[in-house]
Each structure stands twice: as C-alpha cells, then as structure tokens.
Amino acid sequence: MARRKKGDAVSGWLCLDKPYDLTSTTAVSRVRRAFNAQKGGHAGTLDPLATGILPIALGEATKTVPFLMDADKAYRFTIAWGRDTTTLDREGETTGTSDVRPTREQVEAALPAFIGEVDQIPPNFSAIKVDGERAYDLARDGVEFELPTRKVSIFDLKVVDQPDADHVTLTMECGKGTYVRAVVRDLAKALGTCGHVADLRRTRVGGFSEASAIALETLENLSYEARLSEALLPVETALDDIPALAVTDEDAFRLAQGRAIVLLPRQVETLKAELPPGDRTVSAMSGDRLVALCEMRAGKLNPVRVFQLT
C-alpha cells in the first residue's frame, strides 16, 4: 500500500516578492507551509541579499519548472564604486579599492559593449558545480579555481539613476544564466575602477512580474484568513510561450493514460506555424484544464508530462 503524502494536493504557481536576507529554499518552505502543500520548488535561485520575483511552483506545477528556468529575466541594481569584494556584493571581503568614480556619461558610454551575446565568467560565489561541488562551497573553503567563460545574452542595459558620485543604478533584461554581479565586476574593470553590487532586485521572470507579486508577509496573513487561493496562479502560467491545443474529452482521456492522439491536418499546420524553429512542445488543454505537455511528431501528440488536475 502506497504511503499517503503529507499535506494537501495544492497545485499552481505563486509569484513571490522575496524579501531581503532570505534564501530561496527557505522561501519555498514557508510558502509550502502556508498552503500545507505536498510539494514545491522554485524556478531559479535568487540570492539571499536580493529581493524580488521568485516564482514558486506547488504540486503539479513543479512539472513545468524547467520551462520557466529558461525564461528571460529583468533586474534593477545599484553599483557602489570604489571597492571590489570576494563575493562581488557588499557582504564580501575587500579585494581592491579605487578612488576613480565614473560619471553617468562614462557609464552610459561603456554599456553598448555589454549588450548582445557576450562572454561572461560566472562569479566564484555561485551555485555552479565544479567536479560535483558547488562553486560557493569551494570559494568559502579558500580553494583557488576559475569558472569557464560562457555565452550569455543581454538584451537591454541602461542607467536609470545616479543618486551620488559613489553609486549608480541600472536596469537589465537578459537571458538565462546571466549574473548581475559579473556584469558589475566587468563594467567596473572596463571603467578603470572597482565596484560591487550594493542592491539587487529581480523585477521579472518570464511572465511573472511585480504586477502579480505578493509579499511573504501578505501571503501568511491570507493563510490565517483562509484566502490563499486568491494568490495562486494556474499551473499553465509558466507555459505562456508554448502553443496550446484544445482537445476533446476522449483525447484528454487518452493523453492522461499516456497514449498518443492523432491530429487533424489543419491542427498540424496551425501548430507548425506557432512553434519556434526546432521546437515540438505543445500543451493540451481540456477547457481550462491543462491535460498534458506533449511532443508533436508525425502528425501525433505524444504525452511527455501528464497533469493530475481537476
């Protein structure tokens, strides 16, 4: 006899506005506790010292996490000039200092070199694995290593404020795997000075933005008032970029059993026009209910992820 899972079968996404000085893992635990959810996860770590958008998946929504991990992101961050640190933020130990304070005009003139597909070396204090160990663990232990350069995409990078000579605030829109701290490190170097991240806020992950975000304190208050459903977004929220196909009740039943369904020629043509080059992923919907994520091949939809939603 299968062991009964603890908690409720809650499924959906929560757009959390993560507070300062809280790990992403702890944030997930507190959200799960508020909903009494059986399982949960997040779509991309947000540093403890950062605030902002942390999409959290509960229940069946955890099956859609990989699709949001690849989503574009947006940040607002403030650079403090004059000091390099081990962690590239204000918590690290000082590794270098400079009296150079770039003007706003100098910063803006340097930014075009950072836009587009660029080479970036991730920070040593990061969750990237090195020979099976997290880079930040090796860095804390004093192990010397350098992570390999990798390609990242930065779509937009601009100055939005300069409160004083020691600080400048920027916004950035970028693809997956881009580190704000590495951008700040490289920008400071290009400007002949030192600098680190003084403040960091993530403002968007895919379709999850500040407009739909909820603070942890607000969420926990809703828990006391039994109004948590107001904060929960549908499982398919993370699949906005994936073409959807309405299926019949009979086809929904077949997909739920893990069996393929045959598409009509017009359905194949419609989906081909909507799918990005090289992509075959389609979401099958029965009314407002997500039935399965499927792969379209040879005129059929083959279920890859089946959802147990009511």
Swiss-Prot record:
Stored Gene3D superfamilies: Pseudouridine synthase (3.30.2350.10)
Catalytic activity: uridine(55) in tRNA = pseudouridine(55) in tRNA
This protein's name: tRNA pseudouridine synthase B
EC number: 5.4.99.25
Organism: Caulobacter vibrioides (strain ATCC 19089 / CIP 103742 / CB 15)
NCBIfam families registered for this protein in UniProt: TruB (TIGR00431)
Active site annotation, chain numbering: D47 (nucleophile)
The family this protein is said to belong to: Belongs to the pseudouridine synthase TruB family. Type 1 subfamily.
Domain of life: Bacteria
GO molecular function: RNA binding; tRNA pseudouridine(55) synthase activity
Broad class of enzyme this protein falls into: isomerase
Entry coiled-coil feature ranges: none
GO biological process: mRNA pseudouridine synthesis; tRNA pseudouridine synthesis
A Pfam family the protein falls into: TruB_C_2
Known function: Responsible for synthesis of pseudouridine from uracil-55 in the psi GC loop of transfer RNAs.
Disulphide-bonded residues: none
Keywords from the named record: Isomerase, tRNA processing
